[in-house]
Amino acid sequence: MLLLLCVNMSGTQMSAFLRKYLADEDKKIRAQFKESDPNNKLILWMHEKTRITEEDLARPYTEDEVKELCLRTKVKVDMTAWNCLWEAKKRFEAKGRFVNKSERFINRMYMKAVRRKMVQPYPEEFVAQRREIVAAETKKQNISRLDRWQKKKSQNLSAPESSPDAHASSNDAVQSHEDQANTNLSSLSQMNFQVEAMAPPGVSSSDLSGIGDDEDEQQQSGFQDENINRPETEINENSVRCDPINLGRMRTGCINSQANNSFRNTESDPDYYMFGTQLSTLVRPTSTQEPDDQVNCPETEMNESWVRCDQINSESLSIGPSIDSEGTITFQNTESEPIDVTSIA
């Protein structure tokens, strides 16, 4: 019983209004698309295929056709068609009258709009005529569906029965193709979702278009130029090996080019491994005068940069002892008294 209510099984007769309406539509289409123009052949052919005729409306449905239509066709109801309240709703929402309002207030506004004739209900005759047009169009669409489904069934039955595997393989191929297409669409939607989730709050995919522009490329090239122009003699402080002598008193810093130049020029000088008033027996006393190209530090000011532990240049440690021509040991930047070498011996 429910299936019979879904589609009207009996054929219907075309009314005078519907006949006139279809004739007017046909004239409008043929006036717009002339038959003399070869570019309009496809449009006119489609119009002939989709045009509603009296034979279409008079065609009755069988029980199998009604069942198939009810099972394979979705029923759609447009509640906004020829509804004056829907038009009033659009007008009120355009003015913002329903913002943060209760349902009771909204219903009262609908009644007020109809009472003051802001909108008027459609006449019943007009609604009946429009429903007749929609019913005729729906029946034409249902006939096209049934013909298409019947054609597919006849093609499957007309195929040779000796090759059922071929039909199965063809169906599997079509099914796999559809599955692949659905998979591609789903993967594309997932990728778009991840890109948005990764974006910061309040920032859209269009606001990230500035990444990788000329400004960032100039900044990156500036970093590269800075690394290229860096002196070759610069030593990374992490690569300097130091003996554990007064590490707590050392002040970390960067090695400038002047300290590096002094380090190059004094590679042949003796190394002092002990600080204080005693000298290592392995050290040969020589003059510690700096070369001309080396920068001398004042007695009251020391360079805060450091190089190796054997030549520490800091405020808390002396550079190293030296012996003058009279045989007296002195320490630079310290207030210790001179020591006589003869007395030590």
From Swiss-Prot:
**Taxonomically, what lineage is the organism?**
Eukaryota, Metazoa, Ecdysozoa, Arthropoda, Hexapoda
| GO CC aspect terms | chromosome, centromeric region; chromosome, telomeric region; nucleus; telomere cap complex
* Motif Su(var)205-binding Pro-containing repeat 1 location, chain numbering: 231-237
Outcome of residue 198 to I? In strain: Australia 5
Question: Where are the stretches annotated Required for binding to Su(var)205?
Answer: 115-337
According to the UniProt entry, where is the signal peptide?
none
Provide the assembly information. Answer: Component of the HipHop-HOAP telomere capping complex, composed of at least HipHop and cav/HOAP, and may include Su(var)205/HP1; HipHop and cav/HOAP, but not Su(var)205, are interdependent for their protein stability. Interacts with HipHop (via N-terminus). Interacts (via C-terminus) with Su(var)205/HP1 dimer (via hinge and chromoshadow domain) and Orc1; possibly interacts with other components of the origin recognition complex (ORC). Each molecule of cav/HOAP interacts with 2 molecules of Su(var)205/HP1.
Instruction: Spell out the residue ranges making up region: Disordered.
Output: 145-180, 200-231
Summarizing the annotation, the consequence of altering residue 144 to T is: In strain: Canton-S
Q: Select a single GO molecular function from the record's annotations and give it.
A: telomeric DNA binding
Biological process terms in GO annotation: telomere capping; telomere maintenance
The entry summarizes the disruption phenotype as follows: Death at the larval/pupal boundary due to extensive telomere-telomere fusions in larval brain cells.
What name does this protein carry?
Telomere-binding protein cav
Q: What is the effect of changing residue 27 to N?
A: In strain: NC350 and NC358
Q: What does this protein do?
A: Part of the HipHop-HOAP complex that recruits the MTV complex to form the terminin telomere-capping complex, which binds to chromosome ends in a sequence-independent manner and prevents telomere fusion. Telomere capping is independent of the origin recognition complex (ORC).
Q: Where is this motif: Su(var)205-binding Pro-containing repeat 2?
A: 298-304
Q: Which organism is it from?
A: Drosophila melanogaster (Fruit fly)
Consequence the record notes for mutating residue 236 to Y: In strain: Japan
Q: What else is known?
A: Multiple telomeric associations (TAs) in the same metaphase spread often result in multicentric linear chromosomes that resemble little 'trains' of chromosomes, hence the name 'caravaggio', the name of an Italian train named after the artist.
User: Where is this protein found?
Assistant: Nucleus; Chromosome; Chromosome, Telomere
